[in-house]
Regions:
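Residues at alpha-helix termini
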Residues: 25, 46, 168-172, 193
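Amphipathic C-terminal alpha-helical segment
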Residues: 106-110, 161-169, 195
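Long, charge-rich low-complexity segments
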Residues: 192-223
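Surface-exposed helix-capping loop/turn segments at secondary-structure junctions
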Residues: 134-146, 168-169, 192-199
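GST superfamily/GST-like fold recognition
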Residues: 145-169, 177-183
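GST-like domain detector, emphasizing the conserved glutathione-binding G-site
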Residues: 1-147, 180, 214-217, 222-223
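Membrane interface segments of multi-pass transport proteins and intramembrane proteases
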Residues: 83, 172-176
Length: 223
């Protein structure tokens, strides 16, 4: 079997995207935990451009960026497909994945700001959630229909990380009254054995992100 390594971090939703996809495919791999603030020589050598995790190393060849890695996994290991066979449905899945990636910075604005800027950032994130709920998910069980797909994995951080980020920032996000369908999807997603058995400890995540936020907003608090 060709060597397969995943360089990631247990606090990173992007690392978990890759981890979930590999486990869904039943592919064996070696996981290498990376320190986000003291990156290894291996990581810097494998991803010299962005110097970020995750990186998948397959047969000595590194691949950066979680969404690109997901596409590679789908192409390389066709068993248990995560993308639809229908060309239109397949393309729309890719559309919503790209949409989420393009808009991702909006979700982090409320976490990185305070005061009026945080209020504004929270509203912008809620508007984006409405768009995803109405036009991306709709009335489906999952983004691709009745079964887990690549779009669900790409948006999995909303189900498993967004509430942690919101609590760390002292705001409310993804409430069942405001987003009933998206909240229901998030609960279904988290209850899947694949996801449920492969999640970081929530308390540790909350502690980590509270610490990160304090460091991020510290300059704003002193001006």
């Amino acid at each position: 079997m060709e060597e397969l390594k995943l360089l990631g971090n247990r606090a990173s939703p992007f690392s978990y995207r890759v981890l979930w996809a590999l486990k869904h495919k039943g592919v064996k791999y070696e996981y290498v935990e990376e320190d986000l603030f003291n990156m290894s020589e291996l990581l810097l050598r494998c991803n010299p451009i962005h110097k970020q995790i995750p990186v998948l190393v397959h047969a000595g060849k590194p691949l950066p960026e979680s969404i690109i890695i997901l596409e590679y996994i789908e192409d390389t290991w066709p068993q248990n497909p995560l993308l639809p066979l229908d060309p239109h449905e397949r393309t729309m899945a890719r559309f919503w994945i790209k949409f989420g990636e393009d808009k991702a910075p909006i979700f982090y604005k409320f976490f990185h700001t305070v005061g009026e800027e945080q209020v504004k950032g929270t509203k912008e994130a809620e508007e984006l959630l409405k768009t995803i709920e109405e036009y991306g998910l709709g009335d489906q069980e999952f983004f691709g229909g009745e079964e887990l797909g690549l779009t669900d994995i790409a948006y999995g951080w909303i189900a498993c990380w967004l509430d942690v980020l919101a609590e760390a920032a002292g705001v409310e996000m993804l409430g069942p009254q405001s987003f009933p369908r998206l909240q229901a999807w998030a609960e279904r997603f988290k209850q899947l054995p694949l996801i449920k058995d492969n999640l970081p400890d929530r308390h540790k995540m909350l502690t980590f992100f509270k610490s990160r936020r304090e460091k991020i907003i510290a300059p704003a608090a002193t001006t």
